[in-house]
Structures are given as C-alpha cells and as structure tokens.
Regions:
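Hydrophobic residues in beta-strands and at strand termini
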Residues: 3, 71-73, 162, 187
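Active-site-proximal beta-strand/loop segments in catalytic clefts of secreted hydrolases
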Residues: 6, 17-18, 100-102, 143-146, ...
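Conserved beta-strand-loop-beta-strand element in the redox core of flavoprotein oxidoreductases
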Residues: 149-186
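Conserved redox-cofactor binding core of oxidoreductases
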Residues: 34-157
Length: 187
C-alpha cells in the first residue's frame, strides 16, 4: 500500500486523522513467520498496546486504563454523518458489526478509535516526547535519520543503528511504529 508517512515528531500518529488502530493480529504474527523474529506476535505485544493507552470506555482484556495516550470512540457531535452512514450501510448489507476495532474481532462495520483527549490529538510526541523533553534528563532527538537495525543484549534492546545522510551511527532508542516498522524488525 502507498501510505502517507508522518515524517514529523510523533510519526504517523501526528498525521493520521487521530485514528488509533493497532493493525490486524495476523500482520504482527506474520513477522515471526517471515523474518524469524520472536516476541513480536500480537499476543506478545498486547500488554504493550494496553500499557500505552487509557481507554475512555474502561480497561479490559484488550484495553489499558492508565497509559499516556487517551483513546476514545467518537460519540455525539464527533460522529460524522458520512461515517455513520458508512457503518449503517455495512450493517444493512449483512456485515456483522464489531463493537471494538481494537478488540477480539477487528472485522466488520464499526467506529474507529481515536487518540483524542477533549479536543487535543494524543500523538506520541504529545504524550511521550514532550513530557520527556521537559524532564530532568531529556533525550537527544535526531531528525531525518532512518533506523537500519535494532541492537539487542540478553533480549533487551540497547541501541539502534541508523543512517543520517551519508553518516552511519548507533543510537539508544527506536520509535518504529506499525506503518513501516517491520522494515526495522527484519533488519
């Protein structure tokens, strides 16, 4: 697919209409089969997905209750009439609706979850980076670099190899997301 990529602080989470969608479990599960990586299946990643969110409808087996990114389901005036017509027409056509796009069944007409708190976008830069930059020991942020490999010691990621123009170097953290993240996982 040709996807717009968020080449800004916060990555694609800063440009994606505030949609909060983890991706289908089979996408994550295929990484192990295709690239031989361990620990990247949907079930193994689910605790991390839950840790990053505070879900407006409450914590559950699939949702967190005290993470930095607030996730909601559009209600009231936030339900655009065109989106409502799309969901309703899918149900009328016989498709089984799902109540939770990030729950046990991700298929069927439903409302997207949104990374929204009040009326403020909940991007990774707002929820993770800004607080870290305001802290006592702020990280160094490198822009316009491309991660090429994650470095592990004893099962823990301890660094990232990256390219910045013609310079290749090593860093300490990666924020590779679901859109294009598999290229870093397999490197």
């Amino acid at each position: 697919h040709a996807w717009a990529r968020g080449k800004v602080l916060g990555g694609s989470g800063s440009i994606n209409a505030m949609a909060h969608h983890r991706g289908h479990p089979s996408g994550y599960d295929s990484w192990q089969a295709q690239f031989g990586v361990r620990g990247w299946s949907f079930r193994e990643l689910l605790p991390y997905f839950k840790r990053l969110e505070t879900f407006a409808l409450g914590a559950s087996d699939y949702h967190g209750g005290d993470g930095p990114i607030h996730v909601d389901v559009p209600r009231g005036e936030l339900r655009h009439p065109t989106a409502a017509a799309f969901v309703e027409s899918g149900i009328a056509a016989g498709w089984k609706a799902t109540d939770d796009i990030n729950g046990p069944s991700m298929e069927g007409p439903t409302w997207n979850h949104v990374a929204l708190r009040g009326r403020q976008r909940q991007s990774p830069s707002v929820c993770y980076l800004r607080p870290a930059l305001a802290g006592r020991n702020p990280p160094t942020v490198l822009m316009n670099v491309r991660a090429t490999r994650l470095r592990f010691e004893g099962g823990r990621c301890v660094g990232v190899d990256f390219v910045n123009g013609d310079v290749t170097a090593a860093g300490a953290a990666s924020t590779a997301g679901r859109v294009g993240g598999e290229s870093t996982v397999r490197a």
